Amino acid sequence: MPVTDSNNRLKVGVFGIGLDAYWPQFQGLEQRLRGYTEQVAGRLERSGVQVVNLGLIDTPEKALTAGHEFRRADVDLIFLYVTTYALSSTVLPVVRRAKVPVIILNLSPAAAIDYAAFNRLGDRTKMTGEWLAFCQACPVPEIANVFKRCRIPFFQVTGMLENDPLAWTEIAEWIDAARVAHIMEHNRLGVMGHYYGGMLDIYSDLTQQCAYFGGHVEILEVEALAALRREVREPEVKKRVAVFHQSMDVQPDCPPEELERAARTSLALDRLVETHKLGSLAYYHQGTGNPENEDVINSIILGTSLLTARGIPVAGEYEIKNAQAMKIMDSFGAGGSFTEYYAVDYNDDVVLMGHDGPGHLTISEGKTKVRPLTVYHGKLGRGLSVEMSVKRGPVTLLSVVQTVDGRLQLLVAEGESVAGPILEIGNTNSRYRFSIGARRFMNEWNTHGPAHHCAVGVGHLSGKLKKLAGLLGMDCIHVG
């Protein structure tokens, strides 16, 4: 569930660094650099983010105090603005105690010093003070050296304080990535049922997921959903069927009794999510002949699609890694729909990808269709399913990959959702084109050993995903 509690917002720390020995030597320098620091802090402000601004730190003593303040404030990320040369001893105590990633801002107040005006000053003390106001780059190697030796994760943005869209886009992406990391840290992932037997690639280490992403995993029983379904009343069912018609393109051959069956399960799912405060869900259930449980699972797709559209992504086949990937994509505002290879169109050089089960209604090209299926291929029973293509335009694929040495990494590819014929079989189904071509894309993607499912979202997000991986201590591999 997206983090909306005002007490649980992303907290971003910011401080500038300087050298107290300069202030009596160069008139106005301290005030000027404090002004730059306030300017940076102001530009970090945005909805859903609390900025903790500690101003200009210029002594080791102030640095130690700042470290305690950041820790008390529980900041998720620190922006270190280098205003001029400063001793690394005024930096280390701040970030060492906070124990969060650091973004070093090496931002000059202008594109270049006005050399002619500078050299006309005539007073070498004034000239030195002016130079020091442009001396942001000077201490960065010193700081980086110390951070490396202290194993403090850090990243850099280099550019200008003003008139530099590239630098400020980078900064915005760091905030966005930190916001998603914060959401994952507080996410409650429900897992209901069991794995699809024999799909060895999707078996996951839940402790490993918590180690990297944080959050909580809630183990759920299908019987709990069935019990909630028994409590649903007829008037609620009629209203939910109306919601189906409003939010999806229900095809004429969908039997009314199937829509009502799906509505009951959808309402029960909502209650399950609310009871356990879930932000995402992975599920699968084969069953042993219990009619009530089978009835629930066979009618789950419309309800899980509605949840996915609400920012509570649902992954079928108990695909926990992909539930995480879908939550990441949705938290970036890109959607995050469950998908896998379907086929290849070598004539058009596109990869067809889709899946049965939930689709992400908000990233559909047009209204998502609801179709009846007399069989769920490879699964139990029959019922209603959704058919959609992802919106035309740029897309990003994301897989959370478990490596042989017990680590997690993000695997990313950018492509384009293109128009053309699809398989009208009541599944999500899209055509994706990649700059490196369909053959090379598949070979390179598969080489990294992801599970056969991945999440697809709209827009190109590789820059943000790389930053998220950095904040989480993961590698990020970009295919293409």
Task: Annotate each language-model stretch with its function.
Residues 238-332:
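Long, internal scaffold/assembly segments composed of regular secondary structure
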Residues 93-120, 125-137, 303-317:
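Short, acidic/small-residue loops that bind anionic groups at enzyme active sites
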Residues 307-424:
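C-terminal catalytic subdomain
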Residues 75-84, 103-106, 278-284:
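Periplasmic-binding protein-like
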